[in-house]
From Swiss-Prot:
This is Fructose-bisphosphate aldolase 8, cytosolic. The gene is FBA8. The lineage of its organism: Eukaryota, Viridiplantae, Streptophyta, Embryophyta, Tracheophyta. Belongs to the class I fructose-bisphosphate aldolase family. Keywords: Acetylation, Cytoplasm, Glutathionylation, Glycolysis, Lyase, Membrane, Methylation, Mitochondrion, Mitochondrion outer membrane, Phosphoprotein, S-nitrosylation, Schiff base. It comes from Arabidopsis thaliana. The modification S-glutathionyl cysteine is found at C68, C173. Highly expressed in flowers.
Length: 358
């Protein structure tokens, strides 16, 4: 049997293509309450609902930012939240031409029988939740699987388990009208070289697309959110051109042309690094049947967060910092970023957190 055809097939295909529009990308603002608490703590702001809402309102109403975006990933709390003047965030995004998305996984747990590898929870009741999220205005979803590189990792067991979970999630989303973002993140932690990362990335993506095929997922109505192929965090850095070459080659070998767009995660790179690497990929003269874009969280928000510091009088400057990063990444999706963005506070600092939990 070929791809499963849901009653939403045409809508899924149109929305996936829209999210992949060159010149646009995704703002990942789906941090769990615990994770956003750590971000707020870094600027000495208390983790209460009002402050979380204030930060998200700052992001979603920043002048000039929304035209650079095609989607924003929300945490469940934010899907139902309103701005200070009583307007649903979902409506603010839609009016700005941005599709709302929703994080649907329930985090990772250790995979029994492995050396600290993980699997992602959240399949129980997923169909009902997707239906509810669609009714609330969400049009795409995200599920993060996490793999690590070690002497014997990732194991075949971990690769298979995570690929299967992603495929199961993807088909359930499509049954309920949500475009699934398939995110198999290979953590940057370690001292491995770029060749090792490339080999592991190819193995993981090949397994994911085999699982998606086995589950009859409509590839035209999906997006891929992979890591860039880079050396490990404890290894010497390489140039954006080298990262671009290894990343695009790994994708050419594994990602079917039916997939409309690949939206990279930033994986703890600095804001500027992530943008330069994406730009280098789009400048590569080679076969790329999918658009290459971004789905950045930390790499879009860091300088904004530092500029804001929880103070009302800093909102305008913080929104300007967000616009600068959105514009830079918009240009990077077209391969036209000149590296001339005004670097905000924190734009050049590494955002790597070992064993990162979202």
């Amino acid at each position: 049997m070929s791809a499963f055809t849901s009653k939403f097939a045409d809508e899924l295909i149109a929305n996936a293509a829209y999210i992949g529009t060159p010149g646009k990308g995704i703002l990942a603002a789906d941090e769990s309450t615990g994770t956003i608490g750590k971000r707020l703590a870094s600027i000495n702001v208390e983790n209460v609902e009002t402050n979380r809402r204030n930060l998200r309102e700052l992001l979603f109403t920043a002048p000039g930012a929304l035209p650079c975006l095609s989607g924003v990933i929300l945490f469940e709390e934010t899907l139902y939240q309103k701005s200070s003047d009583g307007k649903l965030f979902v409506d603010i995004l839609k009016e700005g031409g941005v599709l709302p998305g929703i994080k649907v996984d329930k985090g990772t747990v250790e995979l029994a029988g492995t050396d600290g590898e993980t699997t992602t929870q959240g399949l129980d009741g997923l169909g009902d939740r997707c239906k509810k999220y669609y009714e609330a205005g969400a049009r795409f979803a995200k599920w993060r699987a996490v793999l690590k590189i070690g002497e014997n990792e990732p194991s075949e067991h971990s690769i298979h388990e995570n690929a299967y979970g992603l495929a199961r999630y993807a088909v359930i989303c499509q049954e309920n009208g949500l475009v699934p973002i398939v995110e198999p993140e290979i953590l940057v932690d370690g001292s491995h070289d770029i060749q090792k990362c490339a080999a592991v990335t190819e193995r993981v993506l090949a397994a994911c697309y085999k699982a998606l095929s086995d589950h009859h997922v409509l590839l035209e109505g999906t997006l891929l959110k992979p890591n860039m192929v880079t050396p490990g965090s404890d290894s010497p850095k390489v140039s954006p051109e080298v990262i671009a070459e290894h990343t695009v080659r790994a994708l050419q070998r594994t990602v079917p042309a039916a997939v409309p767009a690949i939206v990279f995660l930033s994986g703890g790179q600095s804001e500027e690094e992530a943008t330069r690497n994406l730009n280098a990929m789009n400048q590569l003269k080679t076969k790329k049947p999918w658009s290459l874009s971004f789905s950045f969280g930390r790499a879009l928000q860091q300088s904004t967060l530092k500029t804001w510091a929880g103070k009302e009088e800093n909102v305008k400057a913080a929104q300007e910092a967000l616009y600068v990063r959105c514009k830079a990444n918009s240009e990077a999706t077209l391969g036209t970023y000149k590296g001339d963005a005004k670097l905000g506070d924190g734009a050049a600092e590494s955002l790597h957190v070992k064993d990162y939990k979202y």
